[in-house]
Amino acid sequence: MLEAYRQHVAERAALGIPPLPLSKQQTQALVELLQNPPAGEEAFLVELLTYRVPAGVDDAAKVKAEFLAKVAKGEVACGLVSKVKATELLGTMLGGYNVKPLIDLLANDETGAASAEGLKKTLLVFDFFHDVKELADKGNANAKSVLQSWADGEWFTTRPAVPASQKLTVFKVTGETNTDDLSPAPDAWSRPDIPLHALAMLKNPRPGIEPDEAGARGPLKQLEGLAAKGNLIAYVGDVVGTGSSRKSATNSVLWFTGEDIPFVPNKRFGGVCLGSKIAPIFFNTMEDAGALPIEIDAGQMDMGDEIELQVDEASGKVTALKNGTVIAESQLKTLVILDEVRAGGRIPLIIGRGLTTKAREALGLPPSTLFRLPQNPADAGTGYSLAQKMVGRACGLPEGKGVLPGTYCEPKMTTVGSQDTTGPMTRDELKDLACLGFSADLVMQSFCHTAAYPKLVDVKMHRELPSFISTRGGVSLRPGDGVIHSWLN
């Protein structure tokens, strides 16, 4: 396994990207090696276990979590990983298969404190919340400290806030960049492999952009040159992210401008995206990924410029300076974005806020004042369009009422359609969210884009994706069953 893995590492390094995360089979082999390590490989094996296994409810994560749980409980002896170390590693896996073992370990004298620390930063606990509360009610001190930490929002306050001022190096793409420039359709097959797919970003020559290999490999050398200046790179454009809604476009931008998610292989978050105009869906996808998207005049920002970005957290005013001179001013879309960035994304913020609310209710505490609340627009009494009423109905508003533009709301989705060029990415996102069952009434997966001329990766997807959807209570069509829209209608 190690020999084959090192060969894979070398092949990927030649492309300038990290190896793929470990598969279920590789993780099973790794677990066996950890219990009987070849001489000289000990540190490498622990590093692989720590950093190269996916988190959430991936198949490989299950193998890792089960092994660590056995070590932590003393059921398996492993000289390289102590009980406490195993518990700490369980605490880095975000949610899913690690949660139950961590809760079991709370009552253990040796590992209780370490498992409490892990759970304090784990948001994806879902129904296991009740197990922690039950333990706390029985007087378990570790469970009490977890509940108190969730109530205090420590998962949020221990993360860095958006800096009031930060230095950025500008990666400027003039004119309009659409999502096909960032995530080309002919490269759709590689989208779930974020670092590999990112090589195709901006691969076609355009003013100011120098692809390493025109039509095949994007401007990596140019980006490396900018990174050498030592600042975060900001993606800056005149019009950014128009066209088809593609999470893969955000993934590619973040691969070059974001930061690694700790303990999660080949995923990044954060980064700054500045555009004179940013397309709404792209803007939202950036928010989900913990980036800071800001609409601001980018006319005086040029490739390679070092700028200072100042954000006033009280008013949401944004100022961009070059050489100490103000070159543009703007306003954050909403102050809540500052919380989204701090939480590591809009989705972690929504889930985390919910967890904090639940914990405070369980402890009989008043609602938290930790988070910024969105300011919703006032109703001018002008009536609502049908679309506004439909969203209003999904948000539980009374009949005839609608949602105004600029309103913060969390609509309930009863029908979700997933098509196949994005299906594997959707699967990865669901794994990251520790999803073991869908709560929407209908989740349907189609195979209409790849049924006619499948590549090898598509054949593999046709084989594996249906069971992923159906085991979670979704409906999976078969290749050749027809177009997603006709089924949904």
Regions found by a protein language model. Give the residues of each.
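Structural detector for internal amphipathic alpha-helices that build alpha-solenoid repeat scaffolds
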Residues: 17-20, 43-59, 73, 80-95, ...
